[in-house]
């Protein structure tokens, strides 16, 4: 039975209604809550408990699920306007300091500093306090640092959990689990000749046109998700997982800026993107990006890491393919609970299929569950973000200076092998 209090800022928002309450329910079903564990839903709207729960049930149908009514008894609503110190005084009256107290910032980063300050001024930054921060955590290195500085004035790094739901995916978790539990793979890890990390989507920007047009594929997917996967592959495994983030920082700091943009970076935009709702008619935002990246480490010097992400592709794909010397390959499927592992050598082909039959929490539930006992290794450290932004900023500067052209591709009909030929030559 879990014992904690969680305050969810932005409780009436889209993410909370689609993902967060359902994830908390999933944790409740698997592990249970102690009777006095509370979820305090917070928003700007003036709602009674009954009105909020009615809204929540309308959006999620939680009341009709197994033990749903029991779960809902742990939820109450408190109006908190993030720029109103008096509302935080009311919050401090019902918050506790004798068990984990988690504040989930499902709010715009523009409110992070004010919210952190109001929490601290009401003695809500004690040793048991944790902050879970939602992306985007910056638009570049400068703004990433500014966000951290505004929060670190009141909270320590070890109190901050930067959530990247990709790190909670079973397929991504499998990378670490396989490396930890299969010594033979660690021998093969010294023989890697190339790595391909690919996330393709058949969908376009849908209703996110205004938001997406300001960030593009590079910031939306590569800066966080794909570079986090890269770091899990390239890091030296520590003896204690508590040290994993420090090892990932070392890896990300060795990312090399492109020497030749035309041979290492391809960007493109799907035809019709500029006609999407709230997208600028002359937009230069990329919806396709492919990068041939290199690390300056003894083990991976000269080994290409191909990072690929695109929208409006012919198929959905989320995978990592690791190529070894002597034509061995290893492939992870990031969006599935299945691991298909194909190891080949010239004489003894071997196909292994591992199906994990154990129940596994969905990504947000997995990460929320990790935050309760203060497990950080599935959350990014500030220095990981800064190292990734240093690399991403060099690419953004190249885009601004047209170091690589913005190509166009037909929706759902891109010839990938032809399009990516410059990267693989």
From Swiss-Prot:
The active site is at residue 225. NADP(+) binds at residues 44, 135. Keywords: Carbohydrate metabolism, Glucose metabolism, NADP, Oxidoreductase. Its EC number is 1.1.1.49. It holds the Pfam family G6PD_N. One of its GO terms (cellular component) is cytosol. The keyword Translocase does not apply. GO terms for molecular function: glucose-6-phosphate dehydrogenase activity; NADP binding. It is an enzyme of class 1 (oxidoreductase). InterPro entries: G6P_DH (IPR001282), G6P_DH_AS (IPR019796), G6P_DH_C (IPR022675), G6P_DH_NAD-bd (IPR022674), NAD(P)-bd_dom_sf (IPR036291). Substrate binds at residues 165, 169, 201, 220, 311. It catalyses: D-glucose 6-phosphate + NADP(+) = 6-phospho-D-glucono-1,5-lactone + NADPH + H(+). Pathway: Carbohydrate degradation; pentose phosphate pathway; D-ribulose 5-phosphate from D-glucose 6-phosphate (oxidative stage): step 1/3. The keyword Transmembrane does not apply. One of its GO terms (biological process) is glucose metabolic process. Catalyzes the oxidation of glucose 6-phosphate to 6-phosphogluconolactone. NCBIfam families: PRK05722.2-1. PANTHER family: GLUCOSE-6-PHOSPHATE 1-DEHYDROGENASE (PTHR23429:SF0), GLUCOSE-6-PHOSPHATE 1-DEHYDROGENASE G6PD (PTHR23429). Belongs to the glucose-6-phosphate dehydrogenase family. This is Glucose-6-phosphate 1-dehydrogenase.
């Amino acid at each position: 039975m879990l014992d904690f209090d969680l305050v969810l800022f932005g409780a009436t928002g889209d993410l909370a209604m689609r993902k967060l309450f359902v994830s908390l329910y999933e944790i409740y079903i698997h592990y249970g809550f102690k009777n006095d564990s509370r979820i305090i839903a917070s928003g700007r709207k003036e709602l009674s408990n009954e009105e909020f729960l009615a809204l929540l049930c309308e959006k999620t149908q939680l009341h009709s699920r197994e033990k749903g009514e029991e779960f809902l008894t742990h939820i109450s609503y408190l109006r908190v306007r993030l720029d109103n110190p008096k509302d935080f005084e009311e919050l401090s009256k019902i918050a506790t300091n004798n068990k984990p107290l988690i504040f989930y910032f499902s709010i715009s980063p523009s409110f992070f500093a004010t919210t952190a300050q109001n929490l601290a001024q009401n003695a809500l930054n004690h040793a048991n306090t944790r902050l879970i921060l939602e992306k985007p955590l910056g638009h570049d290195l400068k703004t990433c640092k500014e966000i951290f500085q505004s929060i670190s004035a009141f909270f320590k790094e070890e109190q901050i959990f930067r959530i990247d739901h990709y790190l909670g995916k079973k397929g991504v978790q499998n990378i670490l689990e396989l490396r930890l539990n299969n010594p033979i793979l660690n021998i093969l890890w010294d023989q890697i000749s190339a790595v391909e990390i690919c996330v393709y989507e058949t969908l376009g920007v849908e209703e996110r046109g205004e938001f997406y047009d300001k960030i593009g594929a590079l910031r939306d997917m590569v800066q966080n998700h794909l570079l986090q996967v890269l770091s899990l592959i390239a890091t030296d495994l520590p003896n204690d997982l508590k040290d994993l983030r420090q090892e990932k920082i070392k890896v990300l700091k060795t990312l090399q800026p492109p020497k030749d943009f035309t041979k290492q970076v391809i960007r493109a935009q799907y035809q019709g993107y500029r006609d999407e709702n709230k997208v600028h008619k002359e937009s230069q935002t990329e919806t396709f990006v492919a990068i041939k990246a290199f690390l300056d480490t003894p083990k991976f010097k000269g080994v290409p890491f191909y990072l690929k992400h695109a929208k409006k592709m012919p198929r959905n794909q989320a995978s990592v393919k690791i190529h070894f010397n002597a034509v061995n390959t290893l492939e992870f499927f990031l969006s599935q609970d299945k691991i298909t592992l194909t190891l080949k050598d010239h004489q003894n082909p071997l196909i292994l299929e591992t199906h994990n039959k154990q129940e596994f929490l969905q990504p947000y539930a997995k990460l929320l569950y990790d935050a309760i006992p203060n497990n950080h290794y599935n959350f990014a450290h500030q220095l990981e973000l800064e190292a990734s932004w240093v690399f991403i900023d060099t690419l953004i500067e190249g885009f601004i200076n047209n170091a690589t052209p913005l190509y166009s591709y037909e929706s759902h009909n891109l010839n990938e092998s032809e399009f990516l030929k410059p990267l693989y030559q």
